A protein has these predicted regions:
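N-terminal capping/linker segments that flank leucine-rich repeat
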Residues: 2-16, 20-104, 121, 142, ...
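Leucine-rich repeat
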Residues: 77-79, 98-102, 119-124, 132, ...
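Conserved hydrophobic beta-strand positions in leucine-rich repeat
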Residues: 83, 105-107, 124-128, 145-149, ...
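Consensus "Asn ladder" position of solenoid repeat domains
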Residues: 88, 110, 131, 152, ...
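Canonical leucine-rich repeat
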Residues: 93-96, 115-117, 136, 157, ...
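Non-core capping and flanking segments associated with repeat-based/extracellular domains
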Residues: 138, 147, 180, 210, ...
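Long, contiguous interaction/targeting segments characteristic
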Residues: 202, 265, 274-276, 285-286, ...
Length: 430
């Protein structure tokens, strides 16, 4: 009897102790399964509290706090699938973990410095761009398919192994390294404006769009990315770029690098090519007949054949060394910049849609004979002496230019399209 009483006493004592502990536990201790009070303990940010008290769930007229009692029940919290707090003034999203069913979070432009979403394991889409984030915790978010964390101060980005991520936008941060090897389902990667020295995308067979511009890359291997359509790698230090395994490429932006050659023979679907500010001496675009835009200014090109690019509507080949440019077949051309080359003249009469034209500052190195004459009939690019007038520095009779003594450069006006004229120059300095 004594032993039975002793067991009962111990059981009652244990139950009383448990009751006392539960009595003094705060609401937050039951956050995972029970009610959560909208207070400073659970949600330190006052504006976040106000949002939770007054905001409605997207797509409904119901408030998040349905009965307005300042307490979120488990049912109320579990019905929060989308939170859009962009530009709301909230500075701290502590308490976000209390919404376990959250699938979409939009929290851009808030000034957030830290964001821990490790307990929001059903998160599918995350927009947290243009904050001041130095820490982003996503180690448990394996369901994440879309992440935009651009415009922050992140020095590292640790993504969960096995994540379903399809689109990763992390440009304009401070990332010196980025490991995307495990993201086999990634289709879009935008990581420009970071100090990345290397980038390995060899495992990303599903990649369709890659933007890695304005980094510190010296090499870029895209041989395994056969379905790649859009590549933006400008503003790096690339000396070569092999695109022979990218037949689906439609848009290429590789300007401001150190490329001395660019082989586009396998890129027959290209519609946009921007390769300005490189060291290109040759550029063969004859196989890329679908090109609509070519920007190849500030290179070292001595020739450019665009006769097969009949869909072309914009051409910028300024500041090269071109002596010829035939645009007769480019009937759709609307914009042309060929200034600062070596053209003696140009005829654009066939380009009836051309309205934005820059042809100035062209100087052709002409051969002057010992008698100070230049045979104008030998000038390239279909030079027509009848289109030239107002010669300064010499006199023209027929196709012969006689250069004045002491003159090293002759100037003249040239009618390049109907009644439009521009000054061209002949360098006769020898």
């Amino acid at each position: 009897m004594k032993q039975r009483f002793s067991k009962r006493t111990r059981l009652v004592s244990a139950l009383l102790t448990l009751a006392m502990v539960c009595t003094f536990l705060p609401f937050s201790a039951f956050a995972a399964t029970g009610d959560v009070e909208i207070n400073n303990t659970n949600f330190p940010d006052a504006k976040f509290q106000e949002y939770l008290k007054t905001a409605t769930r997207p797509g409904t007229s119901e408030q998040i706090d349905k009965n307005g009692d300042g307490i979120l029940s488990a049912e109320e919290r579990n019905q929060v699938y989308i939170l859009d707090v962009e530009k709301s003034g909230i500075k701290d999203l502590t308490g976000i973990k209390l919404f376990p069913k959250l699938s979409t979070l939009k929290c851009s432009e808030l000034g957030l410095e830290k964001l821990d979403l490790s307990e929001n394991k059903e998160l599918y889409t995350l927009y947290c761009s243009k904050n001041n984030l130095i820490q982003l915790e996503l180690s448990q978010n394996t369901e994440l398919t879309y992440l935009d964390c651009s415009g922050n101060k992140l020095t590292q980005l640790n993504l969960p192994v096995g994540t379903k991520l399809e689109k990763l936008i992390c440009y304009d941060n401070q990332l010196s390294a980025l490991d995307v090897n495990s993201l086999s389902g990634l289709t879009n990667l935008s990581c420009g404006k970071n100090p990345l020295g290397t980038l390995d995308v060899s495992n990303l067979a599903s990649l369709k769009s890659l933007a890695c511009y304005e980094n510190d890359l010296t090499t870029l291997n895209v041989k395994n990315n056969s379905i790649l359509k859009d590549l933006s790698c400008g503003g790096n230090q690339l000396t070569e770029l092999d695109l022979s395994h990218n037949p689906n490429l439609t848009d290429l932006y590789c300007s401001d690098n150190q490329l001395s050659q660019l082989d586009l023979r396998q890129n027959k679907k290209l519609t946009t090519l921007e390769c300005f500010q490189n060291k290109l001496e040759l550029l063969d675009v004859s196989q890329s007949t679908k090109l609509q835009t070519i920007k190849c200014a500030d290179n070292q090109l001595t020739s450019l054949d665009v006769t097969k690019n009949t869909a072309l509507n914009e051409l910028d080949c300024a500041r090269n060394q071109l002596v010829e440019l035939d645009t007769r077949n480019n009937v759709a051309l609307k914009k042309l910049n060929c200034e600062s080359n070596r053209l003696a003249g140009i005829n654009l009469d066939d380009n009836v849609y051309l309205s934005d034209i820059s042809v100035g500052s062209n100087t052709y190195p002409a051969e002057m004979k010992s008698d100070r004459t230049v045979d104008l009939s030998k000038l390239p690019n279909r030079f027509d002496v009848e289109r030239a007038s107002f010669w300064y520095g010499g006199k023209v009779e027929g196709n012969t230019l006689t250069v004045n003594e002491g003159v090293t450069q002759v100037r003249y006006q040239y009618s390049y399209k109907n009644y439009l004229t521009e000054y061209f120059y002949l360098d006769v300095s020898g």
